[in-house]
């Protein structure tokens, strides 16, 4: 049995972390049975101090991309089946854009804006004892702000960050065009990543120009609905 460790639902999302959402999609895309563990204690036991990770018959695999590699190697499932070399390369580049660029812009919106933090990320800490909860929240948010600054995007003003986010959404929208999924009628590996991130960007309760930018692109909105309907038909947070 496979166990996937994550944070759990919030903001109308099946899972608040786009990386954990990606892992859910990968497992479901591969048709593998698994159970989800959203106990916060799993975070403190994470091999690299981050979620997601899986436990598969005693073997622990952390990081959503390495979870994908594990599925491909152990279960023989090709997430890019039928794609050309150029499409595979495009998919990989798009995944890196989502995970190394768009992710940080979403961190800014979710974690550093007080209203959005209360609507979503704060729920991660709900199981902590009340006396220490605000202290831990404040520490984590300071860490996020410092990391965003070190990463580079935190050095830009809000207008510049929004312009960069718009470029990411335009790229996703352009590749998607009028297709159901990024590369055609069926989802592939890149859809697990891009799908997870745009689903997260359109989360309920988020008030931000970044969300408005994504919502202004009709094919992205339809894509979110399609991903949610296919992989999370009974979701809710």
Regions found by a protein language model. Give the residues of each.
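GST-like fold's C-terminal all-alpha helical module
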Residues: 104-219
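Intrinsically disordered, low-complexity polar regions and short flexible loop motifs
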Residues: 219-226
